[in-house]
Design a protein with these regions (language model features):
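Short, Gly/Pro- and small/polar-rich lid/capping loops
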Residues: 1-25, 29-31
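Glycine-rich anion/phosphate-binding loop at the beta-strand->alpha-helix junction
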Residues: 16, 40, 93, 103-157
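Short acidic, glycine/serine/threonine-rich loops at helix termini
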Residues: 19-20, 29, 43-45, 52-54, ...
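Gly/Lys-enriched N-terminal cap/neck module of very large, oligomeric protein machines
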Residues: 20, 26-30, 110, 145-151, ...
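Glycine-rich, flexible beta-strand/loop modules in the N-terminal catalytic cores of phosphate-handling
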Residues: 26-110, 115-122, 186, 193, ...
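Generic structural signal for well-ordered, non-membrane alpha-helical segments
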Residues: 82-93, 125-128, 200-208, 212-218
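Mobile "lid/hinge" segments at catalytic clefts and subdomain interfaces of large enzymes
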Residues: 140-226
């Protein structure tokens, strides 16, 4: 398979999607990055349809200490079960991806997101959603997509106006009174997760509308990549 790379910039931040070089035996594999935070996302789909009354989708988010230039310390120098953050990130990916599959899908689907590099500036969780969507679509899996996710923070300008920040850095998110994560397609929102400090209803609606617009932009970039 020929290596395909798509680089783009949205809302002041640089992104990269790449396929055709790693994990060639997977159904679909995409390396997604924001800055120097780099993730390998693989999707494997079984050929046989299982006789089940539920959709067997599994999402794993694997954090590697080498991604931040460290090795595990202590007596056991090996990485064991996922951290709480890893489990929550896997669920963050599962929630918007699961509804995108067709009704009656009973093939096993396993999505694995592995951190190759973490610059400790850009957050890896929301770009995992874009990586999972792109990996499925590269592999020809019939999903209703593309699917993308964004995190919205906000900052007050000197004139008192509010500026929304898409996929804020750790520092930008820490300074914001709004931490809104939204995922879906160009047409609809399928997942919302939020923490906020007395944000008005009007501001929340504005943030959701802005998030939907940003999701559409990321979906369009995935289509260019494919």
């Amino acid at each position: 398979m020929t290596k395909i790379t798509h680089e783009f910039e949205l809302y002041g931040k640089s992104y990269r999607l790449e396929t055709g070089e790693l994990a060639k035996q997977a159904t679909g594999a995409v390396v997604v990055s924001q800055g120097d935070t780099i993730l390998l996302t693989t999707a494997v789909v079984s050929k046989e349809r299982r006789d089940l009354d539920f959709f067997p989708l599994t999402v794993d988010f694997i954090e590697k200490m080498y991604a931040v230039g460290r090795i595990p310390g202590g007596y056991l120098k090996r990485e064991a079960r996922p951290s709480e953050k890893g489990t929550l990130t896997a669920r963050l990916v599962d929630r918007p991806i699961r509804p995108s599959f067709p009704d009656g899908m009973r093939n096993d689907v396993h999505i694995v997101i592995t951190t190759l590099s973490c610059d400790q500036v850009n957050q890896p969780d929301v770009i995992s959603i874009m990586g999972a969507s792109a990996a499925l679509m590269v592999g020809g899996v019939p999903i209703e997509g593309p699917v993308a996710g964004v995190r919205i923070a906000r900052a007050k300008a000197e004139d008192g106006s509010i500026d929304y920040i898409v996929n804020p850095t750790f520092e930008e998110a820490e300074a914001s009174d709004l931490n809104l994560t939204v995922a879906g397609t160009k047409e609809y929102i399928s997942m919302v997760e939020c923490g906020a400090d007395e944000v008005t209803e009007e501001d929340m609606i504005g943030a959701l509308e802005f998030a939907q617009e940003a999701i559409g932009a990321f979906c369009e970039e995935q289509q260019k990549f494919l």
